[in-house]
Amino acid sequence: MKMLVIVYSGSHPQRITSLLDRHHAEGYTEFQNAHGVGSTGKRDGSRAWPGDSTFWVSIVPEPRAEELMQSLREESSGLPVGERVHVAMLPTESFF
């Protein structure tokens, strides 16, 4: 099993949920309006630092995680200017 943590900054978070559904991620949790700091600066949802992110956590079987990771990488390369997706894949020993 693998845990995927996906962070998307952009106006179309359904891009990510569509990929999760297409790759049969049997469950995921979505957190909207996330704020933070990254390589392109701060996102705080304010006038000074506009923007926010959406992030997801999903536990998937390893072969499916690899396929999903590849699709997310492809999606990332085709995003419009200003939109970003970052993904971390972590080993999961148990999940209940």
Label each region the model flagged.
Residues 1-96:
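Positively charged, small/polar-rich N-terminal and surface patches that mediate targeting and assembly
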